[in-house]
Design a protein with these regions (language model features):
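The feature marks short, hydrophobic/small-residue-biased sequence motifs that occur predominantly
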Residues: 113-151
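Short, solvent-exposed hinge/capping segments at secondary-structure junctions
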Residues: 139-153, 165, 169-186
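"Rare, low-scoring activations can occur
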Residues: 172-173, 196-284
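A short amphipathic helical element positioned immediately N-terminal to and/or at the very start
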Residues: 1-10, 87
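Membrane-proximal extracellular/periplasmic loop immediately following the first transmembrane helix
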Residues: 36-122
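Short, strongly hydrophobic transmembrane alpha-helices
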Residues: 12-41, 50
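Beta-strand-rich non-transmembrane domains
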Residues: 96, 127-136, 151-169, 188-208, ...
C-alpha cells in the first residue's frame, strides 16, 4: 500500500511540486498581509494606561510683533511664564473643570513629537533606550493626566514633590527593565554627558501607558522642568484640562470655545484651539 502511494506521488511529482509551490506562496502572502494587521489590532486593543474620557487639550499661541495689542515688555521669560500660569488658572476655574495643568514641550502622550535618550541602572553598564517627557512640578500634572499609580508615591504626591534638576519619574516597565522590580523608588540611574557622570534619583513610578494609540507601552521617564527659558517655548505651550464627572464633553466644548476666544488671553499669549483628547488620538 505504501509503495503504491509513493508510486502515485512520484508519477504526479510535477503537479505536486506546483501545488507545494502554490501553498508556500499563499502562506507567504498571507503572513505578509495578515501578520501586521494582527499585530496592529492587538496593539490597539491594549488600554492606553491613562484616562482620556474627560481630557481636553488647549493649544496656545503668541501675538506677532506687528499684531494689535502686542506688548514688547511681555516677551521676558518670567512674564511669559506668569501669563502661562494665569491662563492655566483661568482654565482650572472654568465651570465643569476638575483640574488643569500646563503641558510644555513637544513630547507628551499621543503627541506627534518624541524625545529619546538612554539610561542605565546604577552599577550596571547596559543601556536602556527610553522616551522622555517633561513636566512642571506643583501643577497637578500626573493626576490631571490620570496616570495609574505605581509602587510608592501616588500621582498627586509625584506632582507636588520638590524635585531637583536630575530627579526622574519612570513607568513600571522602565523600572522592571532597569531594576527587575516595579518598586524603583529611591534607586538611581546614571548617564554620561560629555565627560560628566549624571546620577538621576528615581522619585516614583507610574503605571505603563501607550505613547501613541497604535503602539505598545514603551519605557518612559519624566523629567521635571526646573529652569525654563520660556522665550524658546512659544510653539510648545498647551493646557491640559480634566472635566468633572458627569460633565458632557460635547456641551463643554460648545460653551468653552467662544469663552476661550474672548477671555483666554494674557500678555502676548492666547488660546488658539481646544479639542478633546479622544479627537487628538483619532487624528494622530
Amino acid at each position: 500500500m505504501l509503495k503504491l502511494i509513493l508510486k502515485n506521488l512520484w508519477a504526479r511529482r510535477r503537479r505536486n511540486v506546483w501545488l507545494l509551490a502554490e501553498l508556500i506562496l499563499v502562506s507567504i502572502v498571507t503572513w505578509i498581509i495578515l501578520d501586521p494587521v494582527i499585530v496592529t489590532t492587538y496593539d490597539r486593543s491594549i488600554p492606553l494606561g491613562y484616562d482620556t474620557d474627560r481630557l481636553c487639550l488647549v493649544t496656545l499661541s503668541t501675538l506677532q510683533s506687528q499684531a494689535p495689542g502686542y506688548d514688547e515688555e511681555a516677551e521676558d521669560s518670567a512674564m511669559i511664564m506668569k501669563s502661562y500660569f494665569n491662563l492655566t488658572r483661568l482654565v482650572k476655574d472654568y465651570p465643569g473643570v476638575e483640574s488643569a495643568t500646563p503641558v510644555l514641550g513637544f513630547a507628551y502622550p499621543n503627541s506627534t513629537g518624541n524625545a529619546n535618550t538612554s539610561i542605565r541602572a546604577e552599577g550596571d553598564t547596559l543601556d536602556l533606550p527610553v522616551m522622555i517627557m517633561e513636566f512642571i512640578p506643583h501643577t497637578n500634572f500626573f493626576e490631571t493626566y490620570g496616570f495609574r499609580s505605581g509602587r510608592g508615591r501616588t500621582p498627586a504626591e509625584l506632582s507636588d514633590y520638590d524635585y531637583t534638576e536630575n530627579d526622574i519619574v519612570m513607568t513600571e516597565n522602565t523600572a522592571e527593565h532597569l531594576f527587575h522590580t516595579k518598586n524603583a523608588g529611591n534607586k538611581r540611574c546614571w548617564s554620561r554627558e560629555g565627560n560628566d557622570t549624571i546620577y538621576s534619583p528615581v522619585i516614583g513610578v507610574v503605571g505603563n501607558f501607550k505613547a501613541t494609540s497604535d503602539s505598545r507601552p514603551a519605557p518612559v521617564i519624566f523629567r521635571p522642568l526646573i529652569s525654563i527659558d520660556m522665550e524658546d517655548a512659544y510653539d510648545d505651550m498647551r493646557i491640559l484640562l480634566r472635566l468633572k464627572e458627569n460633565v458632557s464633553m460635547k456641551r463643554f466644548l460648545h460653551d468653552f470655545q467662544p469663552w476661550m476666544v474672548k477671555e483666554l488671553r494674557a500678555g502676548n499669549l492666547f488660546a488658539r484651539n481646544v479639542r478633546s483628547y479622544e479627537a487628538l488620538i483619532t487624528k494622530n
